[in-house]
């Protein structure tokens, strides 16, 4: 399937690499600034606390619910629709180890009955602060481990300059996606962490395809200009990149629109991550590899000195 028919023309992607790197640097700096100044809106998974899911017989008035909870000592409550307009999820910060989740849940229900007698408790969940801290550390460790493994694999499978470019693109995607959640104040929980790991996998897959084509052209094409070969490789893989991205984005848009509040953050992270991952696989990974000195001679030398499966 072809979206673009270029008639053998090579697009000069790398002519814009300095502009692209400047744009990426600006986004990364803005993301870091927001993360360090504003911070992340960590969810119950990381902060600990109590989540109470309640149901109404009619669509819930979130503004009224927040007002009633504030009047009854729950001013810090986070209230959002959960699955339907009649179900809401109330998230509360930890209130001391001596206060049981059931007690807090009953207090929330009692307060909400002042606004609507039909309210019923669906579910109550408690996460201790120490558990939340452990999950935060383990989540960060999982992401770091994934990046290290990717660096080792790409360096072994291709060439170390490609590995640096691939990991640079992945770090770029992770930082900017996390920065988006910081800027917008969206809740960051385990589902968002899972989405970011999925974005890493998606972006890596695209980067590997491009890197493989660049390596192949370095060996086959009788051109010594590194930039020209990279442009040629990016052009040859462009249709594949666009088809993969567009089909993925269409599914994610459907998930974002009709998936409900439960997976809204997950869909947001994936949707933005696919956009930024597609961009980074074209501009960031290749630009970093060029900066690190990737060349036809380096790749050909690696190919000649490392035995293939047939030689072994």
Segments and roles (model prediction):
Residues 221-241:
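Helix-loop junctions and hydrophobic alpha-helical segments within the transmembrane domains
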Residues 162-214, 272:
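Hydrophobic transmembrane alpha-helices and their membrane-interface caps
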Residues 193-213, 239, 243-250, 279-286:
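Transmembrane alpha-helix detector for multi-pass membrane proteins
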Residues 19, 26, 137, 141, ...:
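Alpha-helical transmembrane segments of multi-pass inner-membrane proteins
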Residues 136-176, 180, 246-255:
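Internal alpha-helical transmembrane segments of multipass membrane proteins
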Residues 1-155, 187:
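Structural signature of multi-pass, alpha-helical inner-membrane proteins
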Residues 302-308:
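Conserved small/polar residues in nucleotide/adenosyl-binding loops
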Residues 153-156, 242-290:
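Hydrophobic, glycine/alanine-rich multi-pass transmembrane helices and their short helix-loop junctions
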């Amino acid at each position: 399937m072809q979206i673009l028919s270029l008639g053998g023309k090579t697009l000069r992607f790398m002519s814009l690499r300095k502009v692209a790197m400047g744009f990426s640097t600006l986004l990364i700096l803005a993301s870091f600034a927001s993360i360090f100044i504003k911070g992340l809106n960590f969810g119950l998974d990381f902060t600990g606390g109590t989540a109470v899911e309640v149901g109404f017989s009619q669509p819930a008035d979130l503004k009224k619910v927040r007002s009633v909870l504030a009047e009854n000592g729950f001013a810090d409550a986070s209230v959002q629709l959960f699955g339907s307009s009649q179900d809401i999820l109330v998230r509360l910060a930890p209130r001391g180890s001596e206060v049981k989740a059931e007690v807090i849940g009953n207090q929330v229900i009692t307060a909400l009955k002042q606004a609507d007698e039909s309210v019923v408790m669906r579910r109550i969940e408690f996460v201790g602060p120490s558990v939340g801290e452990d999950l935060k550390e383990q989540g960060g460790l999982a992401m770091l481990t994934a990046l290290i493994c990717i660096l080792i694999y790409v360096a072994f499978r291709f060439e170390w300059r490609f590995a640096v470019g691939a990991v640079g693109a992945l770090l770029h995607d992770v930082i900017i996606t996390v920065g988006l959640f910081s800027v917008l104040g969206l809740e960051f929980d385990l589902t968002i962490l899972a989405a970011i790991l999925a974005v890493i996998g998606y972006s890596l897959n695209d980067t590997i395809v491009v890197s493989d084509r660049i390596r192949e052209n370095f060996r086959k094409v009788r051109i010594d200009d590194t930039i020209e070969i990279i442009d040629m490789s990016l052009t040859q893989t462009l249709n594949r990149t666009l088809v993969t991205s567009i089909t993925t984005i269409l599914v994610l848009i459907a998930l974002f629109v009709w998936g409900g509040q439960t997976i809204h953050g997950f869909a947001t992270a994936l949707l933005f991550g696919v956009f930024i991952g597609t961009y980074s696989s074209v501009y960031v990974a290749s630009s970093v590899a060029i900066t690190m000195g990737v060349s036809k001679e380096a790749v050909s030398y690696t190919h000649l000195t490392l035995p293939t499966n047939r030689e072994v």
